[in-house]
Amino acid sequence: MAKKSMIEREKKRQRLVAKYASKRQELKAQLASAETQEEIMSIHRQLQRLPRNSAPSRLRNRCWLTGRPRGYYRDFGLCRNALREMAHQGLLPGVVKSSW
């Protein structure tokens, strides 16, 4: 199980990404249509003033059950350990053991 502080930090990042998504998208659109070097530099400065944790690239996928950051399966939102346990218990509809 991941530390509570790491899970909360990740939740805070998700809130910041959602809060600043429109502002960031607007600035990037302005950057694409900017013509002069001064405009480009000004827009870059505005982007740099946004909180660092509001960048989507700083998000890390975590298991919703354990908070584990590695071995994450997007389809389920679970890490491999939790996925295995829940599949064995029959808690994931449509998931069956493979046999060939």
Swiss-Prot record:
NCBIfam families, sorted: PRK08881.1
Keywords: Ribonucleoprotein, Ribosomal protein, RNA-binding, rRNA-binding
Pfam families cross-referenced by the UniProt entry: Ribosomal_S14
Protein name: Small ribosomal subunit protein uS14
Gene Ontology cellular-component annotations: cytoplasm; small ribosomal subunit
UniProt entry tagged with the keyword Oxidoreductase: no
Designated gene of the protein: rpsN
Lineage, broadest ranks: Bacteria, Bacillati, Cyanobacteriota, Cyanophyceae, Acaryochloridales
Keyword Ribonucleoprotein recorded: yes
One of the GO biological process terms: translation
Function summary: Binds 16S rRNA, required for the assembly of 30S particles and may also be responsible for determining the conformation of the 16S rRNA at the A site.
Protein source organism: Thermosynechococcus vestitus (strain NIES-2133 / IAM M-273 / BP-1)
Family the entry assigns: Belongs to the universal ribosomal protein uS14 family.
